[in-house]
From Swiss-Prot:
Organism annotation: Caenorhabditis elegans
Protein name: Palmitoyltransferase spe-10
Recorded catalytic activity of this chain's protein: L-cysteinyl-[protein] + hexadecanoyl-CoA = S-hexadecanoyl-L-cysteinyl-[protein] + CoA
Keyword Transmembrane helix carried by entry: yes
Subcellular location: Membrane
All residue ranges annotated as the DHHC domain in the record: 154-204
Gene name for this UniProt entry: spe-10
Outcome when changing G302E: In eb118; defect in spermatogenesis. Temperature sensitive fertility defect
GO process annotations (BP): amoeboid sperm motility; membrane fusion; nuclear migration; positive regulation of cell size; protein targeting to membrane; pseudopodium organization; spermatid development
Alphabetic keyword roster: Acyltransferase, Differentiation, Lipoprotein, Membrane, Palmitate, Spermatogenesis, Transferase, Transmembrane, Transmembrane helix
Principal EC category: transferase
Record's GO cellular component terms: endoplasmic reticulum; Golgi apparatus; membrane
TM helices/strands, residue ranges: 21-43, 60-80, 198-218, 241-261
Effect of inactivating the gene: Self-sterile phenotype which is slightly temperature sensitive. In hermaphrodites the temperature sensitivity is restricted to the larval stage 4 when spermatogenesis takes place. Premature disassembly of FB-MO before or while spermatids are budding from spermatocytes. FB remain in spermatocytes whereas MO localize to spermatids but often fail to fuse with plasma membrane. Resulting spermatids are usually smaller than normal and contain several or mislocalized nuclei. Fewer spermatozoa are generated and those that are have abnormally short pseudopods and are immotile.
Length: 351
């Protein structure tokens, strides 16, 4: 568990006992988000009033700077808003088995310190658990390709449902999310299938915004030393210098490194948690979700408008194409396309 996950768990436990102060403490978890917003808006103000309004002499040059800077700022804020206000993808109710099946599974799973510990199961218990989990899938009319570290179908004892492929339980939120990437303390929410594209666009546009500020602000630093108005321009220059340093730091870390890191993840069609703990697929331990770089990027950014923070996804976050190393298993899982609201349940079948 990461350091910030421990903080989230502690706050969640505190809120369960102290409603009012716990609610206030929960709101305080947004401090990193507020710091980002303050820095971005303050940087925009300094850029417009000092860089463009004072140091840039050419009207045409100032207009170009203002248009490009404003565009990047608007796209950054739009992407952030979509990231924050898009509902986090939770596991659908159809993955929840009956109470009888749930009780049977828990009865054959060892418990330690009020937690179900699958790793402590005997071979006989594992066999019983897997049989019950198969019954759960039949009951829920779903098919999953992934298994856990002991070879069972994946089940969340805390949330009480079968885990769809690539779903994970977020220890920070205390709930399962579909195609879970990570819980980001910078925005105080989970990054999942539904908002991953917006999150990536936010760090991309914010990075370009910072780099644009830094590049076009160099002229102001040069003019300060050319003008030699050391006292009159000192206040502007100090604020200017502070913005330059903050922009340079955030442009490298976390923004710059995050772009490189997530580019590598998407190229392999992995999530952050899968990079540290790869998904295990039944029937072929070497199988993965890597369908080629273009298809991998399309699975995240959709059919078109990759650079626009609107929904263009071609996937539902529950079913994914699988690249099998063993070609005999290539068509093991075939998805049946059906609307969840149709008379027949949305499901997959095994050939």
């Amino acid at each position: 568990m990461s350091w910030y996950s421990k903080i989230y768990v502690a706050v969640r436990e505190y809120r369960a006992k102290h409603k009012i102060t716990g609610w206030i403490l929960t709101r305080c978890l947004n401090v990193l988000l507020f710091i980002q917003l303050i820095l971005l808006w303050w940087s925009l103000y300094m850029y417009v009033t000092v860089t463009i309004g004072y140091y840039v002499q050419s009207t045409i040059q100032a207009t170009i700077y203002l248009i490009v800077g404003s565009f990047l700022f608007v796209m950054s804020m739009w992407s952030l808003a979509k990231t924050l206000f898009t509902r986090v993808g939770r596991v659908p109710e159809r993955y929840r088995p009956s109470k009888e099946l749930e009780d049977r599974l828990k009865a054959v799973t060892p418990m330690e310190k009020n937690r179900y510990v699958v790793e402590k199961s005997t071979p006989e218990q594992l066999a019983q658990q897997n049989t019950i989990l198969e019954e759960m899938c039949t009951y829920c009319k779903v098919v999953v390709a992934e298994c856990d570290q002991v070879g069972r179908l994946k089940y969340c004892y805390e949330c009480g449902h079968i885990k769809p492929d690539r779903a994970r339980h977020c220890s920070s939120c205390g709930k399962c999310c579909i195609k879970y990437d990570h819980h980001c303390p910078w925005i105080n929410m989970c990054v999942t299938h539904v908002n991953y594209k917006y999150f990536l666009l936010y760090i991309i546009y914010t990075s370009f915004l910072v780099y644009w500020y830094l590049l076009t602000s160099l002229e102001g630093a040069v003019r300060y030393f050319i003008n030699q108005q050391w006292t009159d321009e000192l206040g502007k220059f100090l604020f200017y210098l502070f913005s330059f340093i903050v922009g340079g730091v955030f442009g490298y870390y976390p923004l710059g490194e995050l772009i490189i890191f997530h580019y590598q993840l998407i190229s392999l069609n992995e999530t952050t948690v899968e990079q540290t703990k790869p998904a295990l697929l039944r029937f072929d331990n070497a199988a993965d979700y890597n369908m080629g770089k273009y298809n991998n990027f399309q699975s995240v950014f959709g059919w078109g408008l990759w650079l626009c923070p609107i929904d263009s996804s071609t996937q539902d976050g529950l079913h994914f194409d699988i690249r099998y190393v063993n070609t005999q298993q290539r068509n093991r899982f075939v998805r049946i396309e059906e609307e969840p609201s149709s008379t027949q349940s949305s499901q997959s079948s095994i050939q």
